[in-house]
């Protein structure tokens, strides 16, 4: 932070806790952040709230002002809260540091009307995996029919002011959310009933629209941070800075820049830094540290102003050469008075910690950040979907070339999470029949791919079934011989299975299957058909036998199934054939196995 920054902590050994806001799209994350920011600007003196890159700092005195009687500032040593403004809804998974989450604590925003949605579950998975403590903001309480808003009031106060019916409706919605948390393995209750926040999740009813409950939200966040995280907040602000890249972007006049959160030490504008890149660590010199100009100066031509240094915890835009390969979610470390090779090794080690297991055969995955790549990879591993290549960045033609080398057609696919697909890559994928799946929600991305795999497998099964001789038993009907031989044309009833054309036919005698001929055609009322099912009566032509010699009216005949086909039907395709085909197969196998117990095994 610059010397003049009003949010500088008085106790420079305690940094501001970093807060991430997560939740399903449209559940009110952005509105909640905007309202916290807006309330802070209103409550603070002019200039008390500084604009930050990728973050909003709310100092303790401003929290105290918003929370009123709920907070006694003398109870707290921590300087305030730093809310990360994650780009897009999904980027919490970006925010990793030293193998865990960058955020010290999180707010999971859930719409009281909608409850848990796919991205809520996705957020919960990430919170579990990174072991990040969180509270639930049950948003949109003002939308309960009959709600009487009380702008900016603590939630218990405003709930007490509602009618019994409204209170009852709201409580029902809140307990549904508590139930859903329980289904996902978390014990939860209204925050004012929670005794131990380490064992239970506190639910804070809020309205981003009317600010009701926001005093409680800030109070609970401060209380949790102070009580459970004070030791973790102790840092040496004079030491070399450590941080995480939020976004890599082009900034006019500065070229490629990094939006970053510094969570330990200090970064200065003449420091040499090591940043995680696509091809490994990037070593570069800081040319400028940039902050947005204060709101009252926004009309000036330059959007940013330069500062000499930034101390943890804070957001900053870093301008430096050779940042083209830097990755969102990657570590940043200042070298300063440390051994260069040691710092490079630490960054390499941190990059290696990103748990993405690849195999020789599998799909290609692309994601916008290292953290999302890790989250997607972890989900695919749970679903037992193999990954051949995993990278950060847009889908390029070379990704298509890799995907098309997959041996299995189900693996000739690219799963793209929140990234662009270059036009020439899209054209090439179409040309080479590589399937592209794009989504901003991991669950939906994986679901689309699963549907694709199911469709391929079903088509393959159908193809196999087409080439397999299907089981059937049929009877020659009495008084239904239309032609005795060459070919014999008779009326039949299918007793079980499915009778098809161009199959060999056997009659069982003394435990032996004797081939009597080949069934050539099936007719239904003079029309040729491909098949007939159990219960149907048809006219069939059989090349080979003469009725009255090799076959008789009233005989039961069977389709001759090659032993190899019988084995495939029993062991691989049993679930894909109908119940009466299974019955016909079972009887056919039994007849053979009476003679040879290992037939078709």
From Swiss-Prot:
Belongs to the TRAFAC class translation factor GTPase superfamily. Classic translation factor GTPase family. IF-2 subfamily. GTP binds at residues 23-30, 85-89, 139-142. Residues 207-209 are annotated as: G5. The keyword Chloroplast does not apply. PANTHER family: EUKARYOTIC TRANSLATION INITIATION FACTOR 5B, TRANSLATION INITIATION FACTOR IF-2-RELATED. This is Probable translation initiation factor IF-2. It comes from the Archaea. Residues 48-52 are annotated as: G2. One of its GO terms (cellular component) is cytoplasm. Residues 14-229 form the tr-type G domain. Keywords: GTP-binding, Initiation factor, Nucleotide-binding, Protein biosynthesis. The lineage of its organism: Archaea, Methanobacteriati, Methanobacteriota, Stenosarchaea group, Halobacteria. Residues 139-142 are annotated as: G4. It holds the Pfam family GTP_EFTU. Residues 85-88 are annotated as: G3. InterPro entries: EFTU-type, P-loop_NTPase, Small_GTP-bd, T_Tr_GTP-bd_dom, TF_aIF-2_arc, TIF_IF2, TIF_IF2_dom3, TIF_IF2_dom3_sf. It comes from Haloarcula marismortui (strain ATCC 43049 / DSM 3752 / JCM 8966 / VKM B-1809). Signal peptide: none annotated. Residues 23-30 are annotated as: G1.
